[in-house]
Amino acid sequence: MFGAAATATVFGLLIPLSGCGTSSGDGGGDTLRLVAAEYGNTPATSSKAFWDKVTADFTKANPGIKVKVELLPWADIDREVSRMVASGKAPDMALMGSYSDFAAQGKLYSAEELLSISAEANFLQPLAEAGSVGNTLYGLPFVASSRLLFYNTKLFADAGLVAKDGSPTWQPKTWADLESAAKALKTKGVKYPYALPLGPEEAHAEAMIWELSNGGGYADSSGNYSLASDQNVVTFNWLKTKMVDPGLTGPTPPSQLNRADAFAAFLRGEVGMLNGYPSLSHEARAKGITVGAVAMPVSDYLGTGENPPTVGVADWMMAFKQNGKREEIGKFLDFVYQDKNLADFAGRYHLLPSTVTASRTPSGGGLDKNDEQFLTALRGAQLYPVNNPAWMSVSDTIKRNIGRAVEPGVSPKAVLEDIAAKASAASKRNH
């Protein structure tokens, strides 16, 4: 699954939930059609309730414009929307995990064609940058998330890393601090001292977190892929020799450990440390697990005082030109992006709203103290290179292959170079 809502496990959705909202018909005339990802994981948490209310309120305020919303599982939405566009049946809008391939094809309206200047300027800066191709904003960030390093305070106390009451909080500065904590946890019999989910579900997130903490990442300052950079090779050599080989990452090989499995183990109290996002913290607290959350420690190879960004993730609203409904789409998006609506949606799923003003004025589920930590991290985060049209293909290659870099008898450099070669080929196909 993609995007900020990667925690959602769709509840057996085999067909779109069409007819959501106040509309009827096939999207013709003055009916707008939005295809959106399903963020809920049960009927009770389905996104349908949100869209029903928003579309009804919008039509009441704008008589004559109806909105039809179709909900699709995260596993299907990118493929299905691509199929719709290719067959000449593009929706008016889509909310999903990627946009740049459609922008590269000239299929999308830009933000300045849809929103007021103040609305366009309201997006958090890292999100606006990731939503732009060149200097033009095509992907309108909707909700977002960032990652922090979580630790189980009870397991840390048992290992003598913090006091029994959890104070003072653990404050790792470098990878060596994390390694030392993992060793102490292993000595106490913790099953996963550090959970390293490099399985195919979401390996690209975990890999990027570690690469950024060593001054690396997926792309250079010019936006070109740098997957096999010296910094990234050093990162995976360290992970392999210092964490995986000594057994500090648990019994499941990282290449086979998916994020969902790592999160489930954390909620069972079997994980000392892992990288997580707001919804996991809320789930853990509901189960009585006290969680500490800190910034990812940096590589021992970086200079003193360097403060690399964390990983940010966003989901994107985009508007297609095909049906020529620019004015109606603009009215609807101005309505959806009102603070109360954006904060309500984000609060339902413990995500972060994408705009400056919605972040400052919580409503609905709102931001609590826990979420504020993630918002602070998001303001300085680095997002995936989603504005590169090849990203969907490249991210899939990373997810399926990066875990091999820490397997026994394998050269991390060779694995990274193989991924880089595939990324280069994908980039050429998209130009």
List PLM regions with ranges:
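Glycine-centered hinge/linker elements that transmit conformational signals in sensory
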Residues: 180-183, 222-256
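Hinge/lid segment of periplasmic solute-binding proteins
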Residues: 97-148, 177, 206, 290, ...
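Extracytoplasmic/periplasmic substrate-recognition and gating elements
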Residues: 241, 245-247, 285-351
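Short, solvent-exposed loop/beta-turn-alpha elements that line the ligand-binding surface or hinge
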Residues: 112-123, 166-171, 193-198, 216-235, ...
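Extracytoplasmic/periplasmic solute-binding protein
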Residues: 137-142, 147, 175-226, 271
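Conserved N-terminal structural module of periplasmic/extracytoplasmic solute-binding proteins
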Residues: 2-100, 414, 421-431
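Conserved C-terminal helix/tail region of periplasmic/extracytoplasmic solute-binding proteins
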Residues: 157, 376-431
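A structural signal for short loop-to-beta-strand junctions that line the ligand-binding cleft
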Residues: 92, 120-156, 304-310, 381-388
